[in-house]
Amino acid sequence: MNYTTQMDAAKKGIVTKEMEIVAKKENMDVKDLMELISKGKVAIPANKNHKSLDPEGIGQGLRTKINVNLGISKDCYNIDMELEKVQKAIDMKAEAIMDLSCFGKTEEFRKRLIDMSPAIIGTVPIYDAVGFYDKELKDITSEEFLKVAEKHAENGADFLTIHVGMNRKTAATFKKNPRRMNIVSRGGSLLYAWMELNNKENPFYERFDELLDICEKYDVTLSLGDACRPGCIEDSTDASQIEELIALGELTKRAWERNVQVIIEGPGHMTLDEIETNMKIEKKLCHGAPFYVLGPIVTDIAPGYDHITSAIGGAIAATHGADFLCYVTPAEHLRLPNLDDMKEGIIASKIAAHAADLAKGVKGARDLDNAMAKARRDLDWERMFELSIDEEKARRYREESKAKSKDSCTMCGKMCAVRNMNRVTEGKDLNMLRDDD
């Protein structure tokens, strides 16, 4: 190959096979896509070692993508169950899967995940460090942290979430500006703790050029984590969050100089009125890099329903610039999600993403809704099911209701507006009282 990364190829005017696939999916000219990649406005996470990957683009002008989190924990160490979740995510066409395993030796699961998955795979190397070395966090060296990141890249992870912006300056800002919920990012809290316990700079910030060496070698996209994302609505858009975002913007430019693709991770918990502003701030400070948000979750009082609170926030965020939504399940803040929780989270995120694509005017987004409108006017139930985000549920609800007429449902029966308008415009009687049709 005459290039090292997708960004390097784009800058050189080389069209890669990944670009061709993404351009076709997005119904856009591949040269336009290449231009966006060269400027960092779009990323195609595509590790050279992820052979089963069906690439997707994330960023400006493209369909909003969703990510599914899964992985092994100490309380739920069940590789087979997590692999079932992987298959569920693939079957439901999630564009990305993150392995957030945080206990024991995780490489076996990670390698199986990457081998079987056509979806983009992301990981968080710091979660793996304690188990990888069987060491307490404070005893892990900066060099060892980098080695774990390289192992994940070697395994085939398409993007690595690294909380590089939690440096000493950001930490000092956090200390001066107390929060109601402190730091709620798992990776961010681990790095902050390591820095405090060792009185040292963030190893990934201090050795950022070495991290870029790894990303360039394997064509790994760097997902710059938001250690200071707000964990409750009271902490949103505060000094720590903005200080870190400024640092991420500076790191983004350094990565691009090395032809390493970047995604910026974002909030978090915030009220509806702050979402648009946050999207604009990120795009400004981080130079238009793709934005990957968790939610945002728009109220703190709905445990068991946070797939809804996050879908509300996600739809608004993606309408105003977010490019990539991390799903949230009903189990958020309560437990590790099961398969049913996963499905609910994926559906909610897909609804949010599609609603935003409609609002943004993404090419082809309205085609599905227009097709559904036609199917409904035609009372073509089979076509309605096929077009549904959750075909199984739509079909089951219809079958369980046992409607007396094929033209209507149990809500309106023969008073169905669609049925009656069809009949009267065709010159037919409504037959409201007879059961024969």
UniProtKB/Swiss-Prot annotation:
Pathway recorded for this protein: Cofactor biosynthesis; thiamine diphosphate biosynthesis
E.C. number(s) listed in UniProt: 4.1.99.17
GO MF terms, alphabetically ordered: 4 iron, 4 sulfur cluster binding; carbon-carbon lyase activity; zinc ion binding
Textual note on the cofactor: Binds 1 [4Fe-4S] cluster per subunit. The cluster is coordinated with 3 cysteines and an exchangeable S-adenosyl-L-methionine.
Keyword entries, A-Z: 4Fe-4S, Iron, Iron-sulfur, Lyase, Metal-binding, S-adenosyl-L-methionine, Thiamine biosynthesis, Zinc
Enzyme class: lyase
Cofactor: [4Fe-4S] cluster
Stretches assigned to coiled coil: none
Any one biological process term the GO annotation gives: thiamine diphosphate biosynthetic process
Residues binding [4Fe-4S] cluster: 409, 412, 416
Domain of life: Bacteria
Residues where Zn(2+) binds: 269, 333
Binding locations of substrate: 69, 98, 127, 163, 185-187, 226-229, 265, 292
Pfam family, one: ThiC_Rad_SAM
GO CC annotations, alphabetized: cytosol
Catalysis: reaction(s): 5-amino-1-(5-phospho-beta-D-ribosyl)imidazole + S-adenosyl-L-methionine = 4-amino-2-methyl-5-(phosphooxymethyl)pyrimidine + CO + 5'-deoxyadenosine + formate + L-methionine + 3 H(+)
Family as reported in the entry's similarity comment: Belongs to the ThiC family.
Role description: Catalyzes the synthesis of the hydroxymethylpyrimidine phosphate (HMP-P) moiety of thiamine from aminoimidazole ribotide (AIR) in a radical S-adenosyl-L-methionine (SAM)-dependent reaction.
Name listed for the protein in its UniProt record: Phosphomethylpyrimidine synthase
